[in-house]
Amino acid sequence: MSLATEGLIITQTKIRKRGMISYKTRKRLTPLLYVAPATFLFCLLMLFPMITVLRYSLMDGAIMKKDAAFVGLRNYVTIFADPVFWQSVGQTLYFTVMSVIFHLLIGLAFALLLNTQRVHPAIRSILRVLYILPWLFTAVIIAIIWRLILDPNGVVNSILMTLHIVSFKVEWFSSTKTALHALTFANIWAGYPLYMVSLLAGLQGIPKDLYEAAGIDGANEFQKFRYITIPQLMPIIISIALLDFIWTMQVFPLVWMTTGGGPIHATEVLSTYTYKLAFSSYEFSQASASAIFILILSMSATYFYIKHQKAR
């Protein structure tokens, strides 16, 4: 073989190898190109704002001062020393826990009613539309509806006074004794359809053979519900409850449009507390510290949600 031929073969081999390397590189990079837009948006809309808020929480007079000084954890110490902050934490937990519990109970009850064969299909169709109505309204509309219903001259007080249950007009959203309970009730009404739809889908996915076998073994309706229905629905219940906990803990529009955190901080939750620090008191550094606290709570709940999803 001549030297020219050997050189040609070597050159072709190098070109082929270069092409193979290029192909392998493209194969590795192609998936990254698909996720690049989502990664860019995540960094732009999520990661960058979180880092910015964390930086503000460690500074004095962030945004308001041109040369804001680094103060470490002083803003956290300040809000932790504020009684209103801890009041808002307690009220947030009450608002969230009560909402999640009653969302589950009401959603499960309505799902069972819509799934039963004892109710005529036409009636079930009507009930399905009625029960899902709260989902059709925005938070602003829901706030307006309940402000009208629970107005001192509204329909609730009229009914209660007609039935002689109360002898005076109750200030549902203006009294420190009733405001938080009324607000929680409004949020419960707005949020149960998510559970109803999810649990109804779960009920319809349970094999009928399980109930038939349990009936043959002599199980009554309560035993079927306890030992078949609930265990089959438990993965859905846990997933929805954790998501609902995260969402409810961050509720802002409904609270702001009904009570604004009042009266006298009676319905102050973490979201309204943070908003007032930022846009009423212009304490952006302290508001950032409060926002980081909310983020930590949300991330803790998210951790349990992801752990549960992996276990499934």
Can you say where each PLM-predicted feature lies in the sequence?
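Short, Lys/Arg-rich, polar N-terminal cytosolic tail immediately upstream
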Residues: 1-25
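A structural signal for multi-pass alpha-helical bundles of membrane permease subunits
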Residues: 27-312
